[in-house]
């Protein structure tokens, strides 16, 4: 699997299929990614992004999926703890400690609860935590799904900061950790290099700092 961090919380997984998670980037567009499946963790503008204009098969929590359907998006709803299969891609929705509202004057309001995703494709398991605070059941995500990669927010203020994300990484146990949702704006500035150094000094986990548009290959483990 080829993993590309497009910026903020937006990640493209490329294997036999292409999965785009949280299709928002602060500059430019994700239109050229041409995903087979879009996953949206919650309704905030910096995560739902271009989901409406892409109009690709999309998975989100039920309330948000219904909003997207009303906008002409072929969206499928699910809920936390559930798993669906789409064209050989297994998607499990996990909890996240965050809010979820739709930034649309015509449809403002609750968009269900925020979530994360475990994605399994081509023998690789990726956990995208979405926007979240630290919670102890991250240990169960590690025990149940054994992710190869954990994508964790570190920006603080609206999500975990680096201190909490260090604990989350150890709870989950993924050998590869990639920080997301930081340094997009001043309010979520974070020291990613310090985060990497602290984790790699105290654990056997590896932290990879990708720049926007940079990629890495994740070999199959199953």
Swiss-Prot record:
InterPro entries from the UniProt entry: Metallo-B-lactamas (IPR001279), RibonucZ/Hydroxyglut_hydro (IPR036866), UPF0173 (IPR022877), UPF0173_UPF0282_UlaG_hydrolase (IPR050114)
GO MF terms held by the record: hydrolase activity
Keywords attached to this entry: Hydrolase
SMART domains: Lactamase_B
Pfam families in the cross-refs: Lactamase_B_3 (PF13483)
Similarity annotation: Belongs to the UPF0173 family.
Official protein name in the record: UPF0173 metal-dependent hydrolase Mboo_0816
